[in-house]
Design a protein with these regions (language model features):
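Cysteine-nucleophile active-site neighborhood
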Residues: 1-80, 85-88
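Amide-donor transfer/coupling interface in amidating biosynthetic enzymes
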Residues: 13, 58-198
Length: 198
């Protein structure tokens, strides 16, 4: 509803029609479709809201929120002509919708683990011209090789050379947590803390 009130829906559709890349994650993924149905009025008092119509699916909001840490594989992500394949990719889901195709589209990811339980769930789709895709998986850009592949595909469109992975997100995150722990240990009376805990 916010997109429509602000007129952003027309802007996004106009840019997509010009071939500008569009990526939707979670709620953005749902909005790329034809319609978002909300029979339980989870998100609003509307029974349904028209989507952007950029992807061939309909989402129905459910009463229960899905929250999972996920591991997924990607057999092929042809976004902007790239040829990315990857396994053991990480992310997370936090959504209340179920998305169903209205006609065929290429699936992107195969979720193989949800909160440490083995599953086989298809997630995400890409359009026929390979410049629009969406997924329920948050954190896809935390996967270094996938992020670099997408950045390089965008660089190629601008006539720039491709670059290797230059930043390792998970290593950085771990080192920052270690640094935080060191700071806490240095400036906090841990012995007293454990005494209080009993």
């Amino acid at each position: 509803l916010y997109l429509k009130r602000q007129g952003y829906d027309h802007d996004i559709k106009a840019l997509a029609a010009k071939g500008i890349p569009v990526v939707g994650i979670c709620g953005g993924y749902q909005m790329l479709g034809e319609k978002v149905c909300d029979p339980l009025h989870v998100e609003s008092s509307n029974d349904a809201v028209e989507g952007l119509g950029l992807m061939p699916y309909v989402t129905t909001m459910q009463g229960e929120k899905n929250t999972y840490q996920v591991e997924f594989n990607c057999e092929a992500l042809p976004f902007l002509g790239m040829d990315f394949k990857g396994s053991h990719l990480k992310g997370y889901e936090i959504h209340m919708g179920e998305t169903v195709l209205t006609h065929s589209a290429q699936s992107l990811f195969n979720i193989v683990r949800r909160s440490n339980q083995p599953v086989q769930v298809q997630d995400g789709y890409i359009n026929e011209t390979h410049h629009i895709f969406g997924t329920y998986c948050h954190g896809i850009f935390d996967n270094d090789d996938l992020r670099r592949a997408i950045i390089n595909a965008l660089r190629k469109r601008k006539g720039l050379e491709t670059l290797p992975v230059q930043f390792r997100y998970r290593q950085y995150k771990e080192s920052e947590f270690d640094r935080l722990a060191d700071t806490v240990r240095k400036h906090f009376d841990m012995k007293k803390f454990y005494e209080v805990l009993g």
